[in-house]
């Protein structure tokens, strides 16, 4: 609801908050191997008169920092604009220096090779094209991943567009 109107209350059972809680749990669970996590969220901001009122990516990062993850271990892809910046980020994700990366299918899908320690993929929303979900999952389910068993978590709400998109 806060994407529609930032004045809505912060529901502790929202998809965003459930995802944040899972991110914090999995961060600790995979700490010994520096396991990394990717968060896909295509519907992430509301802009009115070019003034952002709510940005889901920034909110996730803020809550992860409050939850104890150091800020330098969390990356929001929109902060990395040049090829060099992205390449450096992806190296840090592969080394486990950056443990959580947040972004969209377009920015973190096709051509992104960050699989070396990728333990968990979080899908806060479902892309409109099935091929995009395949690309998202392809970031984690691939050769070169040192994590033998990975987790893919999809977040949805019954009787909403989520349910229809996930065909549940």
Give names to the regions the model predicted.
Residues 1-4, 42-47, 81-82, 107-109, ...:
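Short, solvent-exposed loop/turn segments at secondary-structure junctions
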Residues 1-69:
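Conserved helicase/translocase motor-coupling segment
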Residues 69-73, 98, 116-120, 145-153:
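Short glycine-/polar-rich loops that comprise or flank the Walker A/P-loop
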Residues 70-105:
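Conserved helicase ATPase core of P-loop NTP-dependent helicases/translocases
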Residues 76-78, 123, 154:
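Structural signal for conserved beta-strand scaffold positions within catalytic alpha/beta enzyme cores
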Residues 105-146:
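Conserved RecA-like helicase motor core of SF1/SF2 enzymes
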Residues 131-168:
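A conserved SF2-helicase RecA2
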């Amino acid at each position: 609801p806060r994407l529609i109107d930032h004045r809505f209350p912060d529901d502790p059972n929202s998809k965003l908050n459930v995802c944040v809680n899972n991110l914090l749990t999995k961060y600790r669970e995979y700490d010994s191997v520096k396991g990394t996590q990717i968060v896909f969220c295509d519907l992430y901001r509301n802009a009115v008169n070019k003034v952002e009122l709510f940005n889901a990516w920034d909110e996730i990062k803020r809550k992860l920092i409050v939850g104890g993850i150091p800020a330098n271990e969390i990356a929001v892809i929109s902060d990395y604009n040049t090829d060099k910046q992205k390449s450096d980020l992806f190296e840090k994700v592969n080394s486990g220096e950056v443990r959580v990366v947040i972004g969209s299918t377009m920015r973190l899908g096709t051509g992104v090779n960050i699989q070396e320690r990728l333990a968990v993929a979080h899908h806060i929303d479902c892309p409109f094209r099935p091929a995009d979900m395949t690309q998202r999952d392809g970031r984690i389910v691939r050769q070169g991943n040192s994590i033998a068993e990975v987790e893919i978590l999809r977040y949805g709400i019954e009787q909403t567009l989520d349910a229809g998109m996930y065909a549940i």
